[in-house]
């Protein structure tokens, strides 16, 4: 009896101890103290939840990642110091289910995959208490304040300080420094380090990425076989390593709900950064993106301005802002991605098995079968002698075409990550020839040297031209059109590598899609971990896009709209593409005027010696990134415009002296013998006659794309240009295909501070206007932008007109919805989220429409207006501040030819 009572007392005490420990873990989101709790004997008749708690208590404060972990879903092992929890992914080192975060399952093509992945992650993470909104004590959450660290870590209270990790912990693991053995020991031995708060923007001189002490390498935590491990990589190996590291780390660690929970914190951080940025730059050469110093074609005239600071790097800040906006859009739309129509997603998924039957995507006559027949899906743990997927028509593999502006560089990655069961083609649209301001006739009559300073005062005309991806031709036959034979030249994966191997390229050129792939696995060390979409690491197989470097800069106006060609010769991973001896005349370079992550030119050698193990890790990580986004393809073709020869000759006659020879054709414009002012003259011609004659031509054949989404570009185009762009989209879509568009208004709606006299609401607003003076100042800036937009032929409220344009072009089944976000609410989380979205668009339009800081709107100070606006409204609700509207349109192309 005595022993039974003692046992009951012990059980009751332990139960109370478990309750307190569990509550502390959930409320603080931190590991418990290092006290070792008493060992508890599991009761045979206990239920699953109690058994889980007893096992956690029996294991003490945590096991390391390298220890043997149970596969039982009832057990969740945590580390005492949560070394993996301090990783950039912010996830504890627990054993994940086999299908969680794994690439093979996340990239499945069943109909539920598109919407279930994000829900699965949220549900799984909420069970272990990672989500802030599941806790009762928000004050102690690691997300709610500045970055924190464990007691034994070197704590740094400055959130902008760079994070470092001891580099000698890498490469000393079991198996002679092998990849998996070393990383397991790294997770085991790694000291706790500072946790980064994804809801705060870093300083311009710091980095979100984890760097080694030497600064030559970065570290990333990725999920391998259901366990998070740390990989060290060389950022100079691939210029996109840093950007992909930041992108994946944010998406794996943060959920759409965070955009609401931390809306106030994000808004404050954004306003603080924006104020410092505008005060330091004083609107000199303001244009999105913020990272202007990394634009490849900025010339010496720009760098002479006092506000230009080459030491400031806003690339990671800009990337994080884009990720915040994409996340908030998903939350506001309650969708899995900014591809907002779930019905269209279901139709595209249903279409996949039927439309791909003609390609006969079967494996050769062996007993081994690959469960998912979709091309380019990486099969994990595949043997070297296993059959490979066959090649199918690359154009048939495109499900969604994203047409985006140049500065939205993460849009394609985000859509591919959020819609893993659909194949995404990313095409950057350069509409600068349509947006050239031809009103300044005096400037057009000046020579090139006189024109440059004048054009530099108006950045929205200047920046899009520098490094322009536009190409103007005189004959429709000169337009490059993507097809099955040349797709291997213009399609790239997320790591800027050719999407096809040489063998696949040769077979595609023959249009033979049903033969097996024969490769020698002995000559390819990555044969077991590489799909057809991943080029091998050999020097004869790897082909990358040409990366712009400082050595390739030319004069911006001499190079104006000049057709360039990419270098297609085979290079190794460590060879700069800019020194390729072979140049193809059939493709254009991959120009990135808004490059996010700055890195040294590929021609510069790293100061450290690369080991064989490090090269292996770089190659492995590159392939891992491509497998993670294996449904992403980038179309590396310029935006092509057709200018008729008659118009071109007449414009040249007006712009050139009689004794000057005529301009050469666009085909030969890349020749070294071309005239210095050729690009400038072509730009003048386009500026003068573009509104009537310049015709856009998308590089896709008619009736080839199942669905097209085109956000963010409509506010820059007039009504007639809407029709021209929609006609091209209509032509490219297959019968029965879909077109989606997103467009915001250029000004705030329903604000009563500028209402008509006699209106009761306007009089009430004006009577209380003394409380919110910055709202009236904000409306003055919108009025100035509206006048500028009207002068350029733009619609102030495109949400009222774009739907009609879809109907005029020939689309049917048009569905539209307007999302109205109330502004002026600085008292609720939803109000802060609305303000963040509206303030971002306000800032973008202000710097784009009114770039000249010397003449701001009357009685306004745009440099400090954003901060004053927030400080005046914080904790209050301005009922008369109006609302910010965004239109979402989805339309279908008729299945039968449309006749009007």
Swiss-Prot record:
Transmembrane segments: none annotated. Residues 17-27 have a biased composition (Polar residues). Residues 1-16, 30-58 have a biased composition (Basic and acidic residues). InterPro entries: SAM-dependent_MTases_sf. Keywords: Phosphoprotein. The modification Phosphoserine is found at residue 105. Residues 63-76, 103-127, 528-537, 570-601, 665-676 have a biased composition (Low complexity). This is Uncharacterized protein YBR225W. It comes from Saccharomyces cerevisiae (strain ATCC 204508 / S288c). The lineage of its organism: Eukaryota, Fungi, Dikarya, Ascomycota, Saccharomycotina.
